[in-house]
A protein has these predicted regions:
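Conserved class I S-adenosyl-L-methionine
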Residues: 1-45, 49-58
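Class I SAM-dependent methyltransferase SAM/SAH-binding core
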Residues: 59-61, 65-104
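A short SAM/SAH-binding and catalytic strip from SAM-dependent methyltransferases
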Residues: 118-131
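A short, conserved alpha-helix within the catalytic core of class I
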Residues: 129-139
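Conserved beta-strand signature within the Rossmann-like core of class I S-adenosyl-L-methionine
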Residues: 144-153
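Short, glycine-/aromatic-enriched active-site segment of Class I SAM-dependent methyltransferases
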Residues: 158-175
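Short alpha-helix
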Residues: 176-194
């Protein structure tokens, strides 16, 4: 991982306090708009009997909704352990703890340790990782059928927001950086790994792309 983003920086941004706040918000309001749209797109394509891998899924809210909709098993991967307490509490509350495996690791650096899944989700993750091609490519390789990825769209206001956020982080001497990876480069990267875009939607800030594999991968094994 780049020197711009240390484990300490990730733990400060994605803290236990933030995790518990997100869990409380999910209990009250359900999924946020971007996450809700991702879940809707996947349900439209069919999730019954499928397996799920989510990289940077946080408290696991999307996983919970998709497990209720028919996903058989889910794996969540986080860079830091700070979300584990809040996530495990939610899983116990929903009775889904035995269907989710949560792992703490740098997915892009340890891809061989993770099995492929029918569906892979990268929701607002690429903007927090310096090496977009490595992470996006690894996610694409692990998607047997479908990859859902969301990222900031490239507009002047997203550049302003991200620049101000980075300035605040530098002033506060936080070892973390926000990245505005070019959307066309993100999509081109995953398409080089055998996926083709089937939908590409935008909101005010976020872009959500759904990509499907052109030739299905084997039902088991590692990427």
């Amino acid at each position: 991982m780049s020197d711009c983003c240390s484990p300490k920086g990730y733990r400060w941004i994605f803290s236990e306090k933030r995790a518990h706040a997100e869990a409380r918000r999910y209990r009250r309001r359900g999924l946020d708009p971007t996450s809700r749209r991702i879940a809707e797109l996947l349900k439209q394509q069919g999730v019954e009997g499928r397996t799920l891998l989510e990289v940077g899924g946080g408290i696991g809210a999307i996983q919970i909704e998709l497990l209720k909709a028919g996903i058989t098993r889910a794996v969540n991967i986080e860079l830091t352990p700070t979300y584990e307490g809040a996530a495990q509490t939610l899983l116990r509350e929903t009775g889904l703890a035995d269907r989710v495996e949560r792992r703490v690791m740098d997915f892009a650096e340890a891809t061989r340790e993770v099995e492929v899944a029918d569906i892979v989700i990268l929701n607002r993750v690429l903007c927090c990782y310096p090496d977009m091609p490595k992470l996006a490519g690894a996610a694409a390789d692990h998607a047997r059928e479908v990859l859902l990825v969301s990222f900031p769209k490239e507009r002047w206001w997203t550049r302003v927001v991200i620049s101000l956020g980075d300035l605040a982080l530098r002033v506060g001497r936080r070892q973390f950086q926000i990245f505005l990876h070019a959307p066309d480069k993100i999509i081109a990267t995953v398409e080089r790994h055998g996926l083709k875009i089937v939908s590409n939607e935008t909101s005010f800030f976020w872009q959500v792309a759904s990509l499907r594999r052109t030739a299905l991968a084997p039902r088991s094994g590692h990427a």
